[in-house]
Regions:
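Iron-sulfur cluster-binding electron-transfer modules in prokaryotic oxidoreductases
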Residues: 1-256
């Protein structure tokens, strides 16, 4: 299967080590994966800010770059949801009569979803990852409710958590139980710009829950959430390292 790794803008600019870790994990697991040249933003920031035409042009480029691939593995639940929901409709709105947008949307998956659903937890465990720490797990809202990475607390169904299942394969890692496990971090992309006071309050509440349960590190599926929480934690001098799931699985988690 011909696969591509999509690296979100903020990961590319601020956390390239996370992209390298994800690529390392995929290659060790035998996934044939490219990081295409010419890859662009998924278009979500423009769309969320109300600049529809700019967002459409960006997602059209995304579709053109990734159309040849059978699987597009995205290092962000937020970006993955945007592509899955809007790639098809944007291309159709632009007058395209082919189904490239719909195909790209269908083939797009988030990194942890891909590992859990298509590679398999047993195979991931063969990586032999190890990290001694008490960790709090934060799943971004888009990944939780948009992609089904875990059961949201408001849904009365049998519990499941794909991210914890993957992290259970990391030797020495103890996952702590939070009082409000699926609480939003408060970032929300442009929400943090438009409503900074609310965003900060939500982030501090999230950190309070994490630290009160003795977590030594925070692990997440989304670096955008961790960027927000890390900024708040540094300002309050909490000494709380934060890592993407890929860094733990690759064995490259180091304090930043």
């Amino acid at each position: 299967m011909k696969s591509a790794l999509f690296v979100p803008c903020y990961v590319d600019q601020f956390y390239p080590q996370v992209a390298i870790a994800a690529l390392t994990v995929l290659e060790r697991l035998g996934v044939q994966v490219d990081v295409p040249e010419g890859a662009a933003c998924c278009g979500q920031p423009s769309a969320n800010a109300g600049f529809g035409r700019d967002g459409h042009a960006t997602i059209e480029r995304f579709v053109n770059v990734y159309a040849p691939y059978e699987r597009i593995i995205v290092l962000s639940g937020s970006c993955a949801v945007h592509v899955r929901l809007h790639a098809g409709e944007v291309m159709a709105h632009g007058g395209r009569t082919d189904t490239a947008g719909a195909r790209v949307a269908e083939r797009t998956t988030e990194f942890c979803s891909f590992l859990h659903d298509e590679v398999g937890v047993r195979h991931v465990a063969e990586l032999g990852a190890a990290f001694d720490a008490r960790a709090a797990v934060h799943i971004g809202c888009h990944g939780l409710r948009g992609l089904g990475l875990a059961k949201p607390s408001e849904i009365q169904e049998r519990p499941f958590d794909k991210v914890r299942a993957l992290l259970a394969a990391v030797r020495g890692l103890a996952l702590v139980e939070l009082s409000r496990p699926d609480e939003c971090c408060g970032f929300g992309g442009t929400f943090a710009v438009g409503e900074p006071a609310v965003s900060v309050k939500m982030g501090r509440d999230r950190l309070r829950d994490i630290t009160s349960h003795g977590a030594q590190v925070v692990v997440s599926t989304d670096m955008s959430c961790l960027m927000h929480l890390d900024g708040l934690a540094r300002r309050e001098r909490l000494g709380l390292p934060m890592f993407h799931v890929a860094e733990l699985l690759a064995g490259t988690a180091r304090a930043r």
